[in-house]
Regions:
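Glycine-rich beta-alpha junction loops
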Residues: 10, 99-101, 177-182, 217, ...
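Aromatic-enriched alpha-helical interface/lid elements that frame and gate functional surfaces
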Residues: 208-284, 288
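Short, well-structured beta-strand/strand-turn elements
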Residues: 3, 282-296, 357-363
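Oxidoreductase and adenylate-handling cofactor-binding alpha/beta cores
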Residues: 128-131, 150-170, 183, 187-193, ...
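Terminal low-complexity tails and localization/encapsulation signals of metabolic enzymes
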Residues: 214-215, 296-375
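Short Gly/Pro-enriched turn/cap motifs at secondary-structure boundaries
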Residues: 24, 33, 200-205, 210-212, ...
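Conserved Rossmann-fold dehydrogenase catalytic segment
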Residues: 102-103, 134-144, 165-179, 199-205, ...
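N-terminal helix-loop segment corresponding to the beta1-alpha1 unit
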Residues: 1-166, 342, 348-375
Length: 375
């Protein structure tokens, strides 16, 4: 897809000003912006003045999808919301990302509230389950709700595009961070609905071993889902006596006696490196994986074989590696990646090639401050 990012002239996306930064020959760029805006084009456009609004509306007539995640109601005040734009382009797919949803008839009392990533994690029940029972709730990873909501929104956009092929009509895509994170927390909803009980933070009441166990050089992640895998683990450790022990002969018993079993497992693991233990256990039918640091991930043969980290060559600050998209297609396993744009880098290109504006008109728009063109 050709993605055009609308940014404020002179300011740009706030992410451009958030560390960590890369500097070279007096040029400073934000790592987060570089990572999250690959393959996009930057149009620096002031949509708050009449000229800017007209340009935006002209663009809408010529594109397939609008995606925005501004505070609910802000674009409507400018006359650039879905109901305004669908009249200009009935085939338009308009995707709105918000904290709590905007679809008419389904707004709820929180629909106009702003929200950040951690708010969605908290109010979806996820934070309540992350961490340990004797500690405060914790978050998952930085940006989980942002990232997952973006993925869900992209899937929904593709659904809407497919439906448009059948109906010829566009539609409004309402993507709420709360809804997306609740769908990710489906197990909690199922457990509470079926049992009426609150799930326990940091542990399951019917499964064990499950978690990170200490080895000689780090930690090994292990999940034993049933008694068959438990028997394999016991045999591998030379502890067949634990297979039928009443303290460990089923998942519920093992979960109740985790404090008894954890030292036994770690005693077996302690003289072994992660790699050694991983090899032995996987060969014996106990799926495990090393808990990798960032350095481990970058050095992983599996990651390298999958080309899961791609080189991004920025002409100003050099080459860096970022994670590629999560899915590969056999018809196009490797997609060309371009560096994140400078502010206004594609303003002239977009206005001249898509809207067929003359050079004179573009120059006047730049002089008035309606657009910004990278020097």
């Amino acid at each position: 897809a050709e993605v055009i990012k609308i940014e404020r002239p002179g300011v740009g996306d706030p992410r451009r000003s958030i560390p960590p930064f890369v500097e070279n020959n007096g040029i400073k760029k934000a790592g987060g912006f570089m990572a999250y805006n690959r393959n996009k084009k930057s149009l620096a456009l002031n949509i708050r003045n009449d000229e800017g609004k007209n340009i935006y509306q002209d663009l809408v007539k010529n594109i397939d999808v609008v995606v925005e995640n501004l505070r609910p109601g802000s674009v409507d005040k400018l006359g650039l919301g879905y109901h305004d734009l669908k009249n200009l382009n009935p085939r338009l797919i308009y995707a709105a990302i918000s904290g709590f949803g905007r679809l008419e008839g389904y707004e709820g009392p929180d629909s106009k509230r702003p929200a950040f990533d951690i708010v969605a994690e908290a109010m979806s029940g996820i934070m309540h389950l992350v961490g340990f029972e004797d500690k405060p709730p914790s978050w998952t990873i930085y940006g989980m709700a942002d990232i997952y909501t973006g993925l869900c929104t992209s899937f929904a956009i593709m659904q809407a595009l497919f439906m448009r092929e059948r109906t010829g009509k566009g539609q409004f895509v309402d993507s709420a961070m709360l809804d997306n994170m609740l769908s990710l927390n489906e197990r909690m909803a199922m457990l509470y609905s079926i049992t009426g009980n609150e799930p326990h933070r940091g542990r399951l009441t019917h499964l064990y071993p499950r978690g990170a166990f200490k080895c000689k050089d780090g930690y090994l992640a292990m999940n034993v889902p049933d008694d068959m895998v438990w028997a394999r683990l016991c045999t591998t450790m030379g502890r067949d006596d634990l297979i039928n022990d009443e303290r460990s002969n089923n998942g519920t018993a093992r979960a109740s006696n985790a404090e008894f079993l954890a030292p036994i497992i770690e005693e077996w693991l302690s003289p072994k490196t992660r790699s050694e233990a991983e090899t032995i256990l996987n060969q014996n039918g106990v799926p495990v994986g090393s808990v990798y640091t960032a350095k481990d991930v970058f050095e992983s043969k599996q990651v390298k074989s999958r080309k899961a980290l791609v080189n991004i060559d920025d002409p100003d600050v050099g080459t860096y590696q970022f994670a590629r998209g999560p899915v590969m297609l056999s018809g196009s396993p490797e997609i060309e990646t371009n560096p994140a744009p400078d502010l206004g880098q594609h303003s002239y290109e977009v206005l001249s090639e898509i809207l067929r504006y003359s050079d004179d008109k573009i120059d006047k728009l730049a002089e008035s401050g309606t657009i910004e063109i990278k020097p």
